[in-house]
From Swiss-Prot:
Transcription regulation in keyword set: no
Cysteines engaged in disulfide bonds, as pairs: 223-452
EC number: 1.17.4.1
Gene3D superfamilies the record matches: 3.20.70.20
Site description Important for electron transfer, residues in chain: 764-765
Name this protein carries in UniProt: Ribonucleoside-diphosphate reductase large subunit
UniProt-annotated catalytic positions: 435, 437, 439
Lineage: Viruses, Duplodnaviria, Heunggongvirae, Peploviricota, Herviviricetes
Residues holding substrate: 207, 222-223, 253, 435-439, 620-624
Stored InterPro entries: HSV_RIR1 (IPR034717), NrdE_NrdA_C (IPR013346), RNR_lg_C (IPR000788), RNR_lsu_N (IPR013509), Rrm1 (IPR039718)
Superkingdom per UniProt: Viruses
Catalytic activity: a 2'-deoxyribonucleoside 5'-diphosphate + [thioredoxin]-disulfide + H2O = a ribonucleoside 5'-diphosphate + [thioredoxin]-dithiol
HAMAP family: HSV_RIR1
Length: 789
């Protein structure tokens, strides 16, 4: 069957485009690299082989010529086209497995759909093709569905199934349709709104939505938070089999609170919680062994757990032997304020500051936070219930050493997460953990799981140019961001309705909370396109304004749903929202740029309610940023030359904006190549290559995450925290000193600063750039992608 399709003649239009593209590459001066020729009437298979040979030959040269990087991406899109099939075959493909309602909706509007796809080929698709090689490969290898005979879903069909799914479930709720479009509400208007936002890469769905949207396979939720009542192996096994296993098999990322499994090793149970962690590790590895999307688990513990030292030593070289090594799962410290208060006392010079560990006799501490936690913890210490006591600086060192050497634990601030939740958790029992990537804050218990559905706004698509007759530079269009936020709100709500969920407890969590996780990607790219250094006051101001507008328009859309007759989320009457409180009210010194809009929204929420309980979560966008060629999430770029190993080999992704700037500064080819040689010798660091350039120099803004002051990056997270009602997956980027000795105090000082600034996530990954690093950041190094969009 594969031979039948691939052996057919490739459409002449595709062959013509390939020849045109190759001729353009030759005009760049790369004729010698293109010695192979394409047969006069090639088959599809011959076209695939030819493009693969050409791209493989040119890939290494992308590091010195951004034009090749773009051209290779265009060639890969032509390779994709050579594998595309017609709409009729796609609709009936058993591998695509479209849901009945999606297939029926397409057939009912087939003329409009075909017209939309034809328009896409000559408009949005041209822009997509010119993004670059990594974007094209990511679509080809991961997101476009495979069919028998070597066929591949087309880009238009990919966006079609997502837009149709969202349209169908939006049309089932007239209020959702009315929020999405003004004026006439009809299927074609709703479809066009979704298709335009998706194909234009303004709204970027999470990876599960891109993989499974519109299909009768998989779940579209990204994040699951579990807090089963697990106290020993007897209660742990059912939790693993009934909740963890099904979610992992559906490719969901899991945050799992296990603090209550806190019986220290005894003769009857010689390994304590480590036996459970080893089982969980093996389960995760087994499920990932045959999946197209790796998944993961992060286990949450508080630092007073009896086995905390063993937990912190479970990965990599720190594990004493294979029986306790757990390299397939992560850990996160769910840290109370008291820990950092005591560490600060040590830093201030006070001696003898200890940290006490407790077993399950203190399990009730899990349900407490703030002053209540502190009082009870200290009472238990005075009463002698502790099983061990460690100098606070030693405990801090163990945490930091593990993070630096193994990439785990992450660290979150328990009290801040509970303090800023939309319910008063003092009456409900404290939140005990987050998700896999530390950006989702939801209450979970033995009756329901926390579940979050994600999407991000591609910020570079919110830039606009002045009218043609007016001189000026690009500017950030807040109206475009507002429209994108509202569209994303309706889109994710529609996908929430469309999705199935792996377990009953997960379904209940979705139905009762309707939690959205809207984030951003391309923040650093946006600054660069606006000619702003990330450290500039203008960038810091824009950073806050973006977060404010995202929250405002998402909440406004959700409140309007209730205003139009939909019911608020369960428990709204008991939430802070019902009292007119908004997320930023709990933060000091917040300046609003949309004060009147917030005042009107506050009134509407009190009167009508909110359809969703949560809105904004700044997630990592490791995977989806590859298809947009934007910087990941809210982080600066890691390097100016990114290396990504894919199914087709290594791909070098240059910083295209930097490369274009260098080309404009050095128009002579010999001077440009010399500048790139200098940059490569300096490990792709502009500062290392050209020194401290004056402010305003075209190259001065191209710093990497490792070159920025980490305190400043933490401050940027804190500046927008008032408008992020969930949390932010904030990583630290540390450069190792030349002598290779990295003091733990350097990282602890950053964690203390994050704590003092009131963040909820103190550290997602701690990324270390070794003194011997060549400046090429390798994708996959200690990076979890399962819930990273």
């Amino acid at each position: 069957m594969a031979l039948d399709f691939l052996s057919t003649d490739c459409p002449l239009g595709i062959v013509s485009d390939i020849i045109s593209n190759v001729n353009t590459i030759k005009e760049y001066g790369y004729s010698s690299e293109l010695s192979t020729t394409l047969a006069p009437r090639p088959s599809r298979e011959q076209v695939l082989e030819y493009i693969t040979r050409v791209v493989d030959k040119l890939k290494p040269l992308c590091r010195v010529d951004e034009r090749l990087y773009i051209a290779c991406g265009e060639l890969v899109h032509l390779r994709i086209k050579a594998r595309n099939t017609d709409l009729k075959y796609w609709l009936k493909s058993s591998e695509i497995d479209l849901s009945d309602v999606v297939e029926q909706a397409i057939l009912e509007h087939i003329d409009f759909v075909q017209k939309t796809l034809n328009s896409f080929e000559t408009s949005e698709y041209r822009d997509l093709c010119s993004l670059g090689l990594q974007s094209a490969l990511k679509y080809e290898e991961m997101y476009l569905a495979k069919m028998r005979g070597g066929r591949l879903e087309s880009m238009g069909q990919f966006f079609l199934r997502l837009a149709t799914t969202a349209t169908h479930y939006t049309m089932e709720q007239p209020a959702m349709a009315r929020v999405l479009v003004s004026g006439e509400v009809g299927w074609t208007y709703i479809f066009r709104a979704f298709f335009t936002a998706l194909a234009g890469q303004v709204v970027i769905p999470a990876t599960p939505i891109m993989l499974f949207g519109g299909r009768d396979c998989g779940s579209m939720a990204s994040c699951y938070l579990l807090n089963p009542r697990v106290t020993d192996m007897n209660s742990a096994i059912p939790a693993l089999m009934e909740e963890v296993g099904p979610i992992l098999c559906n490719r969901g990322g899991i945050g799992l609170s296990l603090q209550r499994f806190n019986t220290p090793p005894t003769e009857g149970c010689s390994r304590g919680v480590m036996a459970l962690l080893k089982l969980l590790d093996s389960m995760t590895m087994a499920i990932n062994s045959d999946g197209e999307r790796p998944t993961g688990v992060c286990v949450y513990f508080e630092p007073w757990h009896a086995d905390i030292r063993a937990i912190l030593n479970m990965r990599g070289m720190l594990a004493r032997d294979e029986t306790v090594r757990c390299d397939n799962i992560f850990a996160c410290m769910w840290t109370p304020d008291l820990f950092f208060d005591r560490y600060q006392r040590y830093v201030d010079g006070e001696s003898g500051i200890m940290w006490t560990l407790f077993d399950d006799t203190a399990s009730h501490l899990c349900h407490m936070y703030g002053n209540d936690f502190t009082r009870e913890y200290e009472r238990l210490e005075r009463c002698g219930f502790g099983i061990d006591a460690i100098p606070i600086q030693d405990m801090a060192f163990i945490i930091v050493r593990s993070a630096v050497m193994t990439g785990s634990p992450f660290l979150m601030f328990k009290d801040a997460c509970n303090r800023h939740y939309h319910f008063d958790m003092r009456q409900r029992g404290a939140i005990m953990g987050s998700n896999l990537c530390t950006e989702i804050i939801q209450h979970a218990d033995e009756t329901q799981n926390g579940v979050c559905n994600l999407a991000s706004i591609n910020l570079p698509k919110c830039l606009a140019l002045p009218p043609p007759n007016i001189a000026g530079v690009p500017y950030f269009d807040f109206a475009a961001l507002g429209r994108a936020a509202a569209t994303a709100t309706i889109f994710v709500n529609a996908m929430m309705c469309a999705s199935t969920y792996p377990t009953v407890k997960s379904q209940k969590g979705v139905e009762e909370n309707r939690s959205l996780g809207l984030g951003i990607q391309g923040l650093h790219t946006t600054f660069l396109m606006l000619d702003l250094d990330m450290a500039s006051p203008e960038a810091h101001q824009l950073n806050k304004q973006i977060a404010e507008r995202l929250l405002l328009n998402s909440m406004k859309a959700s409140a309007t749903l209730c205003k139009l007759g939909m019911q608020p989320f369960k428990g709204f009457e008991d939430s802070k929202y019902s009292r007119g409180e908004l997320p930023f009210d709990a933060y000091p010194n917040v300046t609003l740029t949309n004060r009147n809009a917030w005042r009107r929204l506050r009134t509407d929420i009190k009167q009508y309610g909110l359809y969703n309980s949560q809105f904004v979560a700044y997630m990592p966008t490791v995977s989806s940023s590859q298809v947009t060629e934007s910087s990941e999430g809210f982080s600066p770029v890691y390097t100016n030359l990114f290396s990504k190993v894919t199914a087709t080999g290594e791909v070098l992704r240059p910083n295209v904006l930097l490369m274009r700037t260098i080309r404009s500064i050095f128009p002579q080819e010999c001077a440009r190549l010399q500048a790139l040689s200098t940059l490569e010798a300096a490990k792709w660091s502009v500062v290392g290559a050209f020194g401290d350039l004056p402010v305003g120099h075209p190259l001065s803004k191209f710093k990497t995450a490792f070159e920025y002051d980490q305190t400043m990056l933490i401050n940027m997270c804190a500046d927008r925290a008032a408008f992020v009602d969930q949390s932010q997956s904030m990583s630290l980027f540390i450069t190792e000193p030349a002598d290779g000795k990295l003091p733990a105090s350097r990282i602890m000082n950053l964690l203390v600063h994050a704590y003092k600034r009131g963040l909820k996530t103190g550290m997602y990954y701690c990324k270390i750039k070794k003194a011997t690093n060549n400046g090429v950041f390798v994708g996959g190094d200690l990076v979890c992608t399962s819930c990273s969009l």
